Amino acid sequence: MQGPTLAVLGALLAVAVSLPTPAPRVTVYVDPPAYPMPRYNYTERWHTTGPIPSPFADGREQPVEVRYAASAAACDMLALIADPQVGRTLWEAVRRHARAYNATVIWYKIESGCARPLYYMEYTECEPRKHFGYCRYRTPPFWDSFLAGFAYPTDDELGLIMAAPARLVEGQYRRALYIDGTVAYTDFMVWLPAGDCWFSKLDAARGYTFSACFPAREYEQNKVLRLTYLTQYYPQEAHKAIVDYWFMRHGGVVPPYFEESKGYEPPPAADGGSPAPPGDDEAREDEGETEDGAAGREGNGGPPGPEGDGESPTPEANGGAEGEPKPGPSPDADRPEGWPSLEAITHPPPAPATPAAPDAVPVGVGIGIAAAAIACVAAAAAGAYFVYTRRRGAGPLPRKPKKLPAFGNVNYSALPG
């Protein structure tokens, strides 16, 4: 009797030992990092607000590379990395003897019939003989405030790192890289494992979620403005430090490096374009009833705004309704102690300088200046009159003898008179 009982107890003990130990839901102390310096010197240049280009401009003549990014565990980091062959592009610029190039990097989240702008960065007067982004001028990085709380660009500023992303982050992302007006698209299909990370930047009570989603027509009509729907954030060096610090305080381990995302073969699109429909009404009606479309709307703060009226999605349509997720607090809430706040490093575009009004002159001083001017004019007039009268009394000035041409070998002058 004892033998079978001990065997059963041993089997139960073995099963218990093999079960994963639940991670403690506590934060740990991590030395706050110092505010990092930029990798090189550059001038931060603001631009007047302008439209964000449409992510739906691809087609047969503009192929899209598709990658697959997956996370091993709910509380891990996730990397969206794909080489856009930018080194080859810069080498071709060197061969053309180009002295500089301009570039823009934009990230979107592609939904059913619409796209959410997530990140926008411009580079001007860049050196083609150096690595990408080594430029004389740069704009501040503009972010979706929710994504900025747990994601940051890679060191080359072409990839994207996410720390413990929540379930609603799953889906399709598109990176648009513009170099001197030529665009290269890369799509990333993000997959997350089952379960939720306890410290992900998502809380139903506080309502963290993405911002508005815009159909293709609103991008084409230049209604999606970068300074209206995106927020200025820390530079890449500081952004990486603040997210890594938050991640490590919750027990996370930052990998020493991230591998490139694997290739992915998407299902063939009907028109050879993007795997996501560009937002026409028929596609929205057909896909709005599917299970995936319903899940996407629930996980991303409500359905996109109506397309029939051509207006931007309303706050209620993007998470503003009661009981639905709403935009969260400022993404710099987890900044290390002693760091400047987000408000301290951000500034609006400088207003045009207005000339200052001249200071008022006292009445007494003005009268004195006028009297002195009148006296000077009177003295000058008196001097001119004195010289004129002297010349009249002396008679006309003697005329200089006129030189006449020689006659033979004799030179002579005409007599005065």
UniProtKB/Swiss-Prot annotation:
<dbReference type="GO" id="GO:0016020">
    <property type="term" value="C:membrane"/>
</dbReference>
<keyword id="KW-0945">Host-virus interaction</keyword>
<keyword id="KW-0261">Viral envelope protein</keyword>
<feature type="compositionally biased region" description="Acidic residues">
    <location>
        <begin position="279"/>
        <end position="292"/>
    </location>
</feature>
<keyword id="KW-1015">Disulfide bond</keyword>
<keyword id="KW-0946">Virion</keyword>
<keyword id="KW-1234">Viral attachment to host entry receptor</keyword>
<feature type="signal peptide">
    <location>
        <begin position="1"/>
        <end position="18"/>
    </location>
</feature>
<feature type="glycosylation site" description="N-linked (GlcNAc...) asparagine; by host">
    <location>
        <position position="102"/>
    </location>
</feature>
<feature type="topological domain" description="Intravirion">
    <location>
        <begin position="390"/>
        <end position="417"/>
    </location>
</feature>
<feature type="region of interest" description="Disordered">
    <location>
        <begin position="259"/>
        <end position="355"/>
    </location>
</feature>
<keyword id="KW-0732">Signal</keyword>
<dbReference type="GO" id="GO:0019031">
    <property type="term" value="C:viral envelope"/>
</dbReference>
<keyword id="KW-1161">Viral attachment to host cell</keyword>
<dbReference type="GO" id="GO:0055036">
    <property type="term" value="C:virion membrane"/>
</dbReference>
<dbReference type="InterPro" id="IPR002896">
    <property type="entry name" value="Herpes_glycop_dom"/>
</dbReference>
<dbReference type="GO" id="GO:0046718">
    <property type="term" value="P:symbiont entry into host cell"/>
</dbReference>
<keyword id="KW-1160">Virus entry into host cell</keyword>
<feature type="transmembrane region" description="Helical">
    <location>
        <begin position="361"/>
        <end position="389"/>
    </location>
</feature>
<comment type="similarity">
    <text>Belongs to the herpesviridae glycoprotein D family.</text>
</comment>
<feature type="disulfide bond">
    <location>
        <begin position="75"/>
        <end position="197"/>
    </location>
</feature>
<keyword id="KW-0812">Transmembrane</keyword>
<dbReference type="Pfam" id="PF01537">
    <property type="entry name" value="Herpes_glycop_D"/>
</dbReference>
<feature type="glycosylation site" description="N-linked (GlcNAc...) asparagine; by host">
    <location>
        <position position="41"/>
    </location>
</feature>
<dbReference type="GO" id="GO:0098670">
    <property type="term" value="P:entry receptor-mediated virion attachment to host cell"/>
</dbReference>
<protein>
    <recommendedName>
        <fullName>Envelope glycoprotein D</fullName>
    </recommendedName>
</protein>
<dbReference type="InterPro" id="IPR036179">
    <property type="entry name" value="Ig-like_dom_sf"/>
</dbReference>
<keyword id="KW-0472">Membrane</keyword>
<keyword id="KW-0325">Glycoprotein</keyword>
<comment type="function">
    <text>Envelope glycoprotein that binds to host cell entry receptors, promoting the virus entry into host cells. May trigger fusion with host membrane, by recruiting the fusion machinery composed of gB and gH/gL.</text>
</comment>
<feature type="disulfide bond">
    <location>
        <begin position="114"/>
        <end position="213"/>
    </location>
</feature>
<keyword id="KW-1133">Transmembrane helix</keyword>
<feature type="topological domain" description="Virion surface">
    <location>
        <begin position="19"/>
        <end position="360"/>
    </location>
</feature>
<feature type="disulfide bond">
    <location>
        <begin position="126"/>
        <end position="135"/>
    </location>
</feature>
